Amino acid sequence: RAFCDEHLDPVRIDREADIPREVIDGLGRLGVLGMTAPRELGGRGFSQMAYGRILEEIGSRCSSTAIFVNAHHSIGMRAWLLFGIEAQTRRWLPDFVAGRKLAAFALTEPEAGSDAANVQTQAVPAADGSHYVLTGQKRYITNGSIADVLTVMARTPVPGRSETAITAFLVTPDMPGFRVVEPRMEKLGIRGTATARLAFEQMPVPSENVLGPLGKGLKVALTVLDFGRTTFGACCTGAAKACLPLAVEH
C-alpha cells in the first residue's frame, strides 16, 4: 500500500499511456512480479488468494499497473511455472521474478480471441529438426511491445497425419522476423498498458523453445488463461471498491 500510494500516479500513467520504468523496477524489488513463483527461484511462494489480494490493492489505485502485473505474472510467467522444463525455468524465471525481464502471452489474432482453438499462426519444422519457422500475426497482446520473452501459440503439423495442432513457443524480440506492428494500441481505458500488434515473418525459433508437449499448446493456453482470468477479476474488484466511496460522495 505504501509503495502504491507513493509511486503510482494513475492520472499521469493514463495521460502519457506508459508505466514508468522506475515503477516496474520498484514492483520487482518488492517481489510483486514473482509473487507465486517458488522461493528457490527468488519468488515469494504466495497462494493465489494472497496474490489476488495484492492485485486488488494495485487495482484500487491504478488499473493499468494492475493489468500490467497480471499479464506479466498470471499469463506470461505462469506458463513457465506450469509447463517449463528445468532448463527453461532456470534460464528465464529469476529475471522475470525480479522484474529485470518482462513476459507476455501471445494468443489473440485477427481471427482468434476467445476461440483459442482457431489460431492461424503457423510453425513449420525445419528438415533437420533444429528449429521451426513461424509465420502469422497477433493482436491485443498486453506487454507485447515491452516483453523480453513471449509465449506464442502456433499451429504445428501432426506427425503422420494431414492436420495441425497448437504448440506453445518461447519467442524473443531479437529473433529475425519478429516485428512490432503497433506498439501501443489506442484505448479508452487502461491506457498505460502496452497493448501491441505483432507479426512473425518467417521467424526461426529453436526447437528447444517449445513450451510443454508438442501439439498440446491449447492445454497450455487454457490452463494459463484460467488462472489469469481469476486474478484479472481481482484487479477489477479493487477498482470497483475504490469507485464505490467516490460514487457515494459524489
Please report, for each region that a protein language model flagged, where it lies by residue.
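Short acidic, glycine/serine/threonine-rich loops at helix termini
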Residues: 47-49, 80-81, 115-119, 144-147, ...
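A structural signal for short hydrophobic beta-strand segments in well-ordered beta-sheet cores
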Residues: 121-124
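Amphipathic, small/basic residue-rich leader segments at the start of a protein or domain
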Residues: 1-71, 78, 84-102, 114
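Short Gly/Pro-enriched turn/cap motifs at secondary-structure boundaries
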Residues: 111-114, 140-143, 159-160, 187-194
